[in-house]
Amino acid sequence: MPKYVEGKLNAEGLKFGIIVGRFNSFIGERLLEGALDALLRHGADDAQITVVRVPGAFEIPLTAQKMAGSGNYDALICLGAVIRGSTPHFDYVSSEVSKGIAHASLATGVPVAFGVLTTDTIEQAIERAGTKAGNKGFDAAMTVIEIANVFKEMK
């Protein structure tokens, strides 16, 4: 009979780090509210949550790698918004941020959730930060709660 491992949605006893980009802060703050709501609803102790604000999305991956490598966190949540403008800047930033966040997780073995919105318009970002399309910060927190518990089961 195989052993099945499936993460529980229980944040009790886990330590979380949240990195939020300040650029497009109206969106980032809504994503942060969603992430904190999910963590606290699922039993996280707010004293075990560290929120780090960085200038923008581009600074998120390095901060995530530093935090993940510290050994102080069971999981991290990366939040922010990159909104397309009239130059190719969006393409460069969104690509490097997504690669960097994935690298931080793979290099350290710490679950790191990608809650950085990459949208064409401010309206799309607002929809994903707590209106029509839910709150992607909440969703990112739910993901890391589950994966952190999967990793605990695998030890």
From Swiss-Prot:
Single GO term (MF): 6,7-dimethyl-8-ribityllumazine synthase activity
GO CC terms: cytosol; riboflavin synthase complex
InterPro entries hit by this protein: LS (IPR034964), LS/RS (IPR002180), LS/RS_sf (IPR036467)
Entry keyword set: Riboflavin biosynthesis, Transferase
Pathway(s) of this molecule: Cofactor biosynthesis; riboflavin biosynthesis; riboflavin from 2-hydroxy-3-oxobutyl phosphate and 5-amino-6-(D-ribitylamino)uracil: step 1/2
Active site: H89
Positions annotated to bind (2S)-2-hydroxy-3-oxobutyl phosphate: S86, T87, R128
A matching Pfam family: DMRL_synthase
Function: Catalyzes the formation of 6,7-dimethyl-8-ribityllumazine by condensation of 5-amino-6-(D-ribitylamino)uracil with 3,4-dihydroxy-2-butanone 4-phosphate. This is the penultimate step in the biosynthesis of riboflavin.
Family under the similarity heading: Belongs to the DMRL synthase family.
Protein name: 6,7-dimethyl-8-ribityllumazine synthase
Organism: Geobacter sp. (strain M21)
